[in-house]
Structures are given as structure tokens and as C-alpha cells.
Amino acid sequence: MKKLFAGLLVLSSFVSVGQRVHFQSGTYVLTTQKESIATADADEKEAQNMYRVVAFDRVLTDAEKGAWQKAGWELVGYLPDRAYLLRGIPGRVKAAAEPQAVAWSRLSAEMKLTQLLSNGNVPDYVEVRDRWEVLFLLADTRSALRFEQQLSGSSVAQVVRIETDEPQVVRVQVIPQALRALAAHPAVQFVQQKEAPAEPENNVGRKNHRTNAIQNEYTGGRAYDGTGVVVGHGDDGDIGPHVDFTGRILANYSNASQGNHGDHVAGTILGGGNKDPRGRGNAPGADLVYYSYPGNLTQVDNHYGLHAVRVTNSSYSDGCNAGYTMNTRTMDQDIRQNKKLMHVFSAGNNGTANCNYGAGAGWGNITGGHKQGKNIIAVANLDGNDAIAASSSRGPAHDGRIKPEVAALGTNVFSTIENHSYASFTGTSMACPGTAGTLATLYHAYRSTHIGQDPDGGLVKAIVMNTADDLGNAGPDFLYGYGRVNALRAARAIEQNRFMIDSLGAGQTDTLNLTVPANTKELRVLVYWTDPEALANAGRALVNNLNFRLVRDGQFWLPWVLNPNKNVASLNAAAVRAVDSLNNVEQVTLADPLAGPYKILVNGFNVPQGPQKYYVVYEFVPDYVELTYPMGGEAVVPGSNESIRWDASAGTTPFTLEWSSNGGASWSFAGTAPAAARSANWSVPTTPTGDLRLRIVRGTQSDETNAPLKNIAVPAALTVAWMCPDSTKLSWNTVPGASAYTVYRLGARDMDSLTTVVAPTLTVVMPAVQNTWFAVAAVTNNGRAGGRCIAIEKGTTLSGCIVEKDASVQSITAPIAGQFPSCQP
């Protein structure tokens, strides 16, 4: 251990009882200190960084915060109750004269730990042999680089290098006894255990977003895979080569490759899963127009017509809380002028940053610029359990508007990288393409149910927000927006035409009728309009201000409104019913609404650029439970663990999972889940069968897979046994319970079924010079193919063939007729 860490286990000493401050690891009492708050110890001087936990007798006003900032301190964030985390550089800070601190402490090692790390009760996945894998959040990128350098050669800690969008985070495998010594480093702000292991597949995102639920694998199910929908994706230079992009790149306007970011994002949007089925994207039927960023934005006016681009994906930042810039104005203008278009952006990875919104670190740090627009979608980053990632940027927008709009899986997303490989990346860069792909499937759904017509981009955005699964505080909030995207609910809203479109001018009021059916558990009504672009120097972005209320029998309900005041308490508070004068979206929800007629009143309160077109979308959430993965027809592996997903109305009764292998004649217990859960792990039965079913039960409610699952192992060790000039032999290991094997070969876009054989070998007649890919799946006892193995590429080099030279017969002069032996025994 280098000198910098010596002696850092000693915590600051307290001299009297003082104020309580709450951290993840526990509650700490701060007291008055004898020494000056600006006094740096030797370690802080060497690190050129010092953190202070400072308590006051009240929440500071902006002016009072400014006094501490003038004294050289950065207010990193608020700590309950009435305390702040301050950061300074030794020798450049002093104590502010007013307001004076009631008490203070150095940020101790224990204060920096999660509760699990503090208690030493870490999950198994954190343990790597005799070490724990943890993530250190440093003060800035420079501090992170120095921290890595100081760990070089350490016997108790080793840096784990992975590709990440978070340069301030250092991943380390550390001996548990040394954890607190490292945490006490003056530049370390926070330490957490490594993330829970993700399923090694983009299928996690498909299940989270419910795109799997509208791309069913059973006869008669939905098949909205984005076919024919064009996505404009701008990123870090050329992508590929990758077999998952086969037949999917409509046009490529990129420069030379600069890395794997673009490959990964493209695969998340529409990868075919040709090599590894687990890497299938959200819209595998869609087409891609690819650019070096920001070509997908600068060229959209031309390519909206030339290539029929309908959705764009941009996982790039454009400043932090940059305000309503010229870029923002252009994005809003794009959507207004190209009515069938929608821009999708990552919200950003600055969740802990202070981007000068005015509430300190952790708020108002959307990384744009362009993603501050009113008419676009900015996406937050969730993990596989629907928890917001610490790095995910928060709202509000610069003027207090709701940001982000929605959230999606962005943590440990498995997708394509160059040279036919895959990797797991984390960031809103990954949540954004999951949402863009989901939108492509919804455009497909609209075309399929509306005689081939495209929906307005604003309508799709409204449907996505109103059908999202509410997370965080009830109603919209500045972390999750309107919640996690739910493609199944959105597709049903499209199929059932649960929307109305109208327009009005200044001072006009429209009255729209709505009948709520019986047994509705929740009613959601959302009004949205594509607002004209504002002047770039305008103090408030909203131009046309519509107001909306829901009315029944003289009683009325106003939309949910957030408080954008620049303090932590306001920004953390749940939405309240009020008049909204900031946003171009307003939503009313009612729990357990009475059945019968309601009226939707939309008023053009201030419409300087009218008339204004608007969309009303509505959702009747029944009292129900519904499996969303698996839905039927999926392949599972005996003895494996599957992450099961379902949707359900709110309730207090827990869920029970059951499985059957006899057509539902009897059911076996598979596990339970709490009432608030919407996912659970299932240990798949070990006996192979083509007739496995799953159901979920809550009280008298239940739902089961719409068709049997295919429970059989994936063939292993697929290889090219030999390759001759005119044929290639494939072989693989046998699979227990398999009645046959289906062999797949790469087609124009996807892996197509070639033939089915009984033995674990196949000789394919084809020229050796023809490059292609093969895969194989085991067939169950009732003739249903299970999951494909990872595909292998057949090259063009002869191997294992008795023929020593690559020669061909041009003509036969003698004998005129007869039989010729094969070149293989």
C-alpha cells in the first residue's frame, strides 16, 4: 500500500453531542470541531481534495449557498437533515462568515459505504475469490486516474478495467480488510458493491421493455418487430463487421470506426441475434441508416424523405443543463415540421453532477442541449430490477420542465461489438437505443392496424408516456419521468385506438367524452401537444399553453404537477394536482374510478402560435395479472434460472409461480414473490419436454403461458468437421431428450431453418468458397425446436479433406459413362 493510504482509517474526533446526519451506512452525529473546517490534513493535501459534511440550523437559501461557494467550496449535495456535502481544494477554501456551520466532520470511510459494505453482508456475486469487487466514485476524472495509478502494484487491491461511460468511477477487487483504508482516500466520495450479475443478453432489455411480449413465438401472437421502420442512428464511426447486422443497414454515412459504442447501440436497437440469440435487439425487423454523430440529426430533414427515417437515436451529450440552445430549438422544429418523426436521446450519465440548476449536485443535470427539447424523448437508465442508476441524469430541464420523459434498461446491457463479438455496457447510452427500438416496434404496430399509415411522432410519445409503468414517486418525477416503457401496453393502446386527436386556438375549450368501463383499477388520461419551437434566448420554453382537467358529475381533477423550485425537498416531492404552465404534457390518473361517463376539458389558455394540434390518450388498467415473459413458445434450458416478468394492477396479495409439464392437468410450486414485485427468478425443471407451461397466481387471479415452452438443452461444440471443395460436414454433441436436430443457415437477414436430422451431424453441399454461418437446435419429444446454439462461421479454407489440392473437373473424356467414388470415405 502506498504512502497516501497510510493511517487513513482514523476517523475525525468529535468533541460534543451535535446534529444527526443520515447516510446509507447509518446515522452519524456531527459536533462542533476545535479545528477550522478549512484545515487540511497531510493526506488531503497530497490528494488535493477534501470533503466536509457540514450541518446548519436550517436549509440554506441560494444566497447562503453562494457565500460558501465564494469561500471556495463546491456544494456537492444535500444530506438529511439540514446538512451538505462540501468539496474543496486545500489552501483555496475558508469558512464562510455567514451562515456559520452548526457542526462538521470529514467525510469518513464509513460514511462513504453502502449499508451492505458497512455491515460486511455482501451478496455472493460481489466475492471474487478472497476479494470483493466494488466501485469507487471519485471527485473528478483526474482524481480517478490518480487513484488508479496509486493502486498499481498493490497487493490488496487490483483495478478492473471495463469499457464505461463513467470516467469518475474506478472498479476494484479489494481484500475486505483493506476496504475502509481505500474508502478513506480523500478523493473518494462513495463506494458501492458491484452490480448484481446481469443475464448475459439483450433479452433482459426486451423483457423489461416488454418488446418480447409483442414479438410472440407462438402461432397467432403479435409480431411487431419493427419490420420496415427506419431508425437513424448517429454514433462513433463505422460499425461491424457483425453477422447480427446482416441485411439491416439500409445506408451508411459514417467515418472510420472509433470504437465499439456505435456497434453496441446499433445491436440494442435492431441486432438480429444471429450469432448469439441472447443478443437480439428490441426491433430486429427494423432497418438502420447509420451516421457518424451528429449526422443523424443534421441530415434528418433530407433523410426523413429519402430514407423514410422515422426514429433517431443519439446517445451523445451536448453540454450539461445547457438550457434551451439553438440545437434544442432545431430538435423541436424537426418534430414539428416532420410530423411522423421522433428523436430519442440518452438523458445522460451525470446523475451526481452539479450542472448549476440551482439545487446542488444530483438535480438538473440532463446532458443537453438537444435533449432539453419539449418535443423529443430523453431516457433515464434503469437496472434489471427497475432501480434508477446512480449515474443516470436527473431533471428538471433548465426551466423546470419534466425530464427525463421515460426510463429503460441501461445497466449491464448485452449487445454487439465489432468482429462478431458481444459485451455488456452500462449507461443511458444503452437505455436510449432500447427505447428507440421499442418505438420502432410501435410504429410497426400502428402501420399493421392503420392500413399502413405512420403515426405522428407526438402521438407515439404520448402513448409511450401514458402506458409506462410508474416507478419512483407516484405520478411523474424528475428521476424516472413517467416510468419504464411498456411496449405491450402501448401496442394495445394502438390496437384499440385509445386516443383522440383535435386542435384548438386561443381561448377555445374542447369537451371530449370518455366512458370508463366497470372494474377499472386505474384510469390514466394524458394530453400532449407538439409545441412550436421557442426562441433560443427565451426564459421559458413553452410557447402554446393548453390546460386540461377531467370532469365527472361536477367534480374535477387537475393534472399532476411537479415542483421545480431549486431545492432538494421540492424536487424530491411527489407530484400534486395543479394547473401546469411549464410542460406540453399533462396527465390525470384516478385510482379505482367509478364506471361511467367522464368529460375531458382542454382549454387553449395561451396559444400565440395556433391553432394547436393535441393528442389525448387514455388507459383503463384492469384489476389483473398477466405474464409478459415467458408468454409461450420460448425456449428454456433444463436446470437454468429464468427471470420471469409480469404486469399487474396494484394490490397487497403476494404472487405464486407454478409450472406444469402435462398440459396443465396438474401444477407444481415454483416460488413466490411479494405483492409489489413484477419479476422473479424461476429454476427451470430438469426434465426435457416440449410441453412445459408456467402460470402466475394472485388470489383468484391467474395467467399462464399462451402456448407450451420448449425445455431442452442447447447443443454444444458445433464445429466444421471437414470442408471440401463441394461440401462441408458439421458435427455437434448430442443433447439429452432430443428427438432430432434442426440446422440453421444464415439467410438474407436471419438464421433460417435449413433441415432437420436425427444424428448429430450434417453434410451440406455448397462450394467451399462460399462464406456463411451455421447453428443448430435440439428438437423436443413433440417435434419443437429449442434454443439455437451460438452460431459458427464457415470460412473458405479447406480443412480435414482427403483431397490435398483444391482442383475441379472441367470435362470428362473417358469413360463416357460409369460411377465415380466420393472424395470422402
Model-derived regions: residue spans:
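Pro/Thr/Ser/Gly-rich low-complexity, intrinsically disordered linker/stalk tracts
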Residues: 710-736, 782-801
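Hydrolase catalytic cores
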Residues: 268, 407-474, 600
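Beta-strand-rich modules
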Residues: 764-784
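Autoinhibitory N-terminal propeptides
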Residues: 18-224, 228-230
